[in-house]
Amino acid sequence: MKVLGNILWWAFVGFMAYATLIKPDNTDPAVVNYEEPLPMELANYGEPGEGAKIMNAAKIMGRDYAWKHVKEDRLPCLFAAGVVADNILVKYHFSNETEFKLKAAAVRECANVAENNGFVLVGRVFEKRN
């Protein structure tokens, strides 16, 4: 019984740490915030703007930190795009083939938006350039 209590305690502690550390704050002006419902056109990954739809869905998927700056000048955009795409896949139960196409679209759109806003890809992280 004590072992079960310990397991439950550490599960609770882990959940609280996850919720505290991962939960985004909406104070960053670089956060994408959209209120309209996520269109099911996300499945039409071949249409123009599919990556934008994926990234714009960040708020709806509970991951509205996709564009949040880290250390004031770094944007872990490729990782964030993957997280957003994963959340969409889980919610709408897309197939594995669609999964790769959605992630690719999210990363492409992420790179385009970042570069248009003065970021340059250095390794796997975008850095702000003046």
UniProtKB/Swiss-Prot annotation:
Signal peptide: 1-19
Keyword field: Signal
Top-level taxon of the source organism: Bacteria
Designated name of the protein: Uncharacterized protein YffR
Annotated organism of origin: Escherichia coli (strain K12)
Gene giving rise to this polypeptide: yffR
